Amino acid sequence: NKKISCVKKDGTRFSQEYDKVILATGSKQIMLDIPGNNLANIFSIKNFPNAKEIFKALDDSTIKKVGIIGAGYIGVEIAEAIRKRGKEVYLFDVADRVLSTYYDRSFSDKVEEILSKNGIHLCLSESPKKYLGRKKIEKIVTTSGTQYSMDMVVQAIGFLSNSPIGEKELLRDVSGAYLTNEYQQTNIKDIYAIGDCATTFFTSINRSSVDFSISNALRTAYIATQHINNQDFTPSGSQFTNGFSIFNYNFYAAGLNLKTARLLSESIDYIEIE
């Protein structure tokens, strides 16, 4: 009696029997619900088609000032790419430093130094309160009360798991992702979940959490398919490993940074090696 109820785009309904199911429904972008969010030249970026749309818009010679909302990996990397197109770039984040969830301050200070050296304006400890303009974006008003003239905005704030299937049957974690075990099985053993829509086991914290990355999507897909094919293996778990490059500098990290670790435990010891 294992069936999936489906609805086609034209509204037609049908049922499909299954032996195993893999949910790979991905994630959806967090959008700012503020006045002016519907103005032209305000973009979001999650995938390659979004990036193509943004870079096509940059061909407009009247676009000179671009605001990037969110100083995580995507925000920092898109800021670099747009700066290399000759635009004046402003990078906003509510935190007091860039990449605050990934790196300790000594590393993020270095990233900020590189960004500033290459002409990117850092607007930290502030975020947009509203967007102003007649038809197109003209100004960003931030939580600090400052107004920035702007010709274009790219929102790179973050993601939420897209997990609408099995609302009553499948368990979620606090973030809304499908809760899975070390083999990516949900609470219904023949239904697996992988990638952005699912949790995965992290050795750093000894529990499951969400990792919105391509490498995690590939890794969890491998784990699920190996288990479905009855391969004898034990997943090693993830270690929050990540990396990125800006202006010919490469940065890598594995495990938790000090800020995140202190949220999980009050007694944290650490050393710095240079």
What is the predicted function of each stretch?
Residues 1-8, 16, 84-180, 269:
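A Rossmann-like FAD-binding core segment of flavoenzymes
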Residues 20-85, 121, 174-175, 180-182:
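Glycine-rich dinucleotide-binding loop and its adjacent helix/turn
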Residues 23-24, 142, 155, 193:
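Redox-cofactor binding/interface segments in oxidoreductases and associated redox assembly factors
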Residues 38-62, 147-223:
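FAD-site-proximal beta/loop scaffold in flavoenzymes
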Residues 200-274:
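Mid-to-C-terminal Rossmann-like scaffold of FAD/NAD(P)H-dependent oxidoreductases
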